């Protein structure tokens, strides 16, 4: 319908009109398209035109049942036109050119009339279509905005539910992790409690061992006290016996009045032994006092340690829930206690070794004292023998002095012989004994001391 006006150019004024086989009346039918118009089925009188083609430049026109209004101009042809046609049947032009042109003009007029009619019908159809479209209620799309709002709300709820589910899943995972942590903490606490209980049992056993050691040491102290008392008693008895013996001997020797000052010697010996005994006694008392003080201090320290252990046990019972935090502190405390126990055992062993060494020293001193006492007893026996021999000699000399009435000169070898002086007889050293016979000796030229005498 939007095609341009056609310009018919007929070459050299010739027209070829195809005719039908029957040669009936002419009928024009137009067919329009975007760029062509074709005439078909033209027939007039005894001849029929089956097709008529009009060359319009580059476009062609075929007559059909309809032809658009703009395909041809409203007026006639202003320019020359050419038509070509073929006769069917006889194919021979009859009449002259004027009739042919008239025929063609009539045909063209009818054709144009038909075109105008079709244009009017087309316009009428267009107006009817336009009226129908105006009368027809326009189709409205349904309003889905409320549904969209509902869908958006539901989507928001779904997103919130998904986020809530994710949060719940995260919380569940966190709760599971926390439960696992608490389970591991509980297991560690249980194991730590078992370890602490085992440590407490070990400390109780150590405390029992220390109590037994304390009882043993107290028993040893008591036995050492008793032994010390026995030693003191024996020492006092021996000292008293020695004093009695030395006192008796002193009384006897005072009467003898020897040239050697035995009293001074005995006094010196007595002073030495008394000082030695006093020093030994003082040392023994000091040692005993120091050992007693040390044992008391050890008892006090053991009681303090026992109290500290009890306090630690109470503190451990209170701090069972915080064992994981104080684990290292408890380990260090245990190490400190073990080191203290080792130091205590080492100290006790060293003190025991010292006590054994002191006991060995005291025993060696006692052995030396016994040896000294035996030596003194031997010397005392020797002195008693000497005393007996001296008393025997004195009694012998007295008997001889009393029995003899002969008067011997004191110096018979001198030129002046005086009968008033006499010489004492000489006795051999071997004859001075309690069981020997008393014999006299011949007078000597010079009165000198006997070779075996002590005076």
From Swiss-Prot:
Residues 98-132 are annotated as: Coil 1A. SUPFAM superfamilies: Intermediate filament protein, coiled coil region, Prefoldin. SMART domains: Filament (SM01391). Keywords: Coiled coil, Intermediate filament, Keratin. Residues 133-143 are annotated as: Linker 1. Residues 261-404 are annotated as: Coil 2. PROSITE patterns: IF_ROD_1 (PS00226), IF_ROD_2 (PS51842). GO terms for cellular component: intermediate filament. Residues 1-97 are annotated as: Head. Pfam families: Filament. GO terms for molecular function: structural molecule activity. The record marks 346 as: Stutter. GO terms for biological process: epithelial cell differentiation; intermediate filament organization. Residues 144-244 are annotated as: Coil 1B. Residues 245-260 are annotated as: Linker 12. Residues 97-408 form the IF rod domain. The keyword Coiled coil applies. Residues 405-455 are annotated as: Tail. The keyword Phosphoprotein does not apply. Belongs to the intermediate filament family. There are two types of hair/microfibrillar keratin, I (acidic) and II (neutral to basic). This is Keratin, type I cuticular Ha5. The gene is KRT35.
